[in-house]
Amino acid sequence: ECQRIVLAAGLANAELAPMVGLQQSLKPQKGQIIVTEKLDQQMALPSLLLRQTDEGGLMIGDSHEDTGFETSVRPNIVSGIADRALATLPALADVGVVRSWAALRVMSKDGYPIYDQSEAMPGAFAISCHSGVTLSAAHAFDLAGYIAEASLGQELDRFSQRRFNV
């Protein structure tokens, strides 16, 4: 027996949440990225298109595709990402690409996270969002504290699945 259980299983939360009395309306959205070789110079600020890793490589990507659960890399999409990156930062023309890949984002109907606590099982929570990169600090600090205290708090009500029940 445990006092808390957190469902944070990505798209599988749609199937798992009903087991604890919750609903998570989720759909997949494919995104593709390019990763460059490591760069000595650090970018001052991330953008919506470019982010630099601690190791120095750039993660470049801004694609949004509705392909169901299909995750193959499409050269025309990767080429478009590269073209937009070069238009934004022409110095990238001399930077090598190390790899590219596609993955699925976990999307709610409105694109915002879903944070819910079960009324049927008060220690059970379901957490779904599309960006571990931008929301990871909130999840690691703020959200973890709410879960530890067994209450998400009224300020997170706007992120409940209930917002779709109108």
Q: Predicted regions span which residues?
A:
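C-terminal catalytic lobe of FAD-dependent flavoproteins
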Residues: 89-166
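Active-site lid/adjacent beta-loop-alpha segment flanking the redox-cofactor pocket in flavoenzymes
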Residues: 37-121
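Mid-domain beta-loop-alpha active-site segment that forms a flexible
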Residues: 10-12, 77-84, 128-129, 133-135, ...
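Glycine-rich, phosphate-binding/catalytic loops in enzymes
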Residues: 22-25, 77, 143
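Short glycine-/acidic-enriched loop or helix-start segments at secondary-structure transitions
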Residues: 16-18, 45, 69-71, 136-137
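Central helical "cap/lid" subdomain
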Residues: 2-42
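General beta-strand recognition
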Residues: 1, 59, 125-126
